[in-house]
């Protein structure tokens, strides 16, 4: 099993403000790892709101959820849902009905250990927005964190707050071992709007947060289309967004990829004359 820590597989979480594309990113990132042959699980930590299974297209298959496993009302094997698109990807849904207090540190740790012992190479923890219990639980056991943010001041401020919590409350911070490895993922990025001064540039965001950039996801309607179809956008062939997520997975796995979708290409004279955008 691959991992940053000596204790088997890595645990990944993603965080940020509501609506920044965390769950979309979790679904596509986990799917991208599975497409690369990695046995991967993705866990929804948003108790009460549950939407990862909708984006993954498996909402009708949910019988048991993470809280059932924590309360020993079901086994992990019973609760895990096999993904429709990737044989080596499994989803652990959140509970729609339970109280957030049912999410205990001991219970989450037991699930993660069982997953590691079952041969999962990567465990992606999809964190809810803000700093509520589910978010803190998702980051507690992280080996690496992908901070998902929009290029807007309020979103970047929220991400800065989350970085503070990771650096103070993660198990790695508490035990004084090597800190959680942090990555910055900027979503809904429009170089044209950056050029017009309507949006922070990726350099601005990096300057504020001071963590390494793992990738940029361009603003695109294909994300909404994919969500409505219950298909992670990484599966949409030939779309910029799909290519961007594949680049992120490659960088995460240690491969070099040029940074795409970051610069505004002004339309040429002919396209302006003939009405191109």
Task: Locate the predicted segments by residue.
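Post-Walker A helix-loop "phosphate-sensing" segment adjacent to the P-loop in P-loop NTPases
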Residues: 32-41
């Amino acid at each position: 099993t691959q991992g940053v820590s000596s204790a088997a597989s890595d645990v990944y979480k993603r965080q940020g403000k509501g609506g920044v594309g965390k769950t979309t990113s979790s679904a596509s990132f986990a799917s991208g790892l599975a497409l690369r042959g990695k046995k991967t699980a993705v866990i929804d930590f948003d108790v009460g709101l549950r939407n990862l299974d909708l984006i993954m297209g498996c909402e009708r298959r949910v019988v048991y959820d993470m809280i059932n496993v924590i309360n020993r009302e079901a086994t992990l094997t019973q609760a895990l849902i096999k993904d429709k698109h990737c044989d080596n990807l499994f989803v652990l849904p959140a509970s729609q009905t339970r109280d957030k207090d049912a999410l205990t540190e001991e219970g989450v740790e037991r699930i993660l250990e069982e997953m590691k012992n079952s041969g999962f190479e990567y465990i992606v923890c999809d964190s809810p927005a803000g700093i509520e219990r589910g978010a803190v639980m998702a980051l507690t056991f992280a080996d690496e964190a992908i901070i998902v943010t929009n290029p807007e001041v309020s979103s970047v401020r929220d991400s800065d707050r989350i970085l503070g919590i990771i650096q103070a409350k993660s198990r790695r911070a508490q035990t004084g071992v090597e800190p959680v490895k942090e990555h910055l993922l900027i979503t809904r990025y429009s170089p044209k709007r950056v050029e017009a001064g309507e949006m922070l540039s990726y350099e601005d965001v990096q300057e504020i947060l001071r963590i390494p950039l793992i990738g940029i996801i361009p603003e695109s309607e294909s994300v909404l289309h994919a969500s409505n179809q219950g298909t992670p956008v990484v599966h949409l062939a030939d779309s910029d967004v799909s290519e961007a997520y594949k680049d992120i997975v490659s960088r995460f796995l240690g491969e070099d990829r040029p940074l795409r979708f970051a610069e505004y290409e002004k339309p040429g004279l002919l396209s302006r004359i003939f009405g191109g955008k």
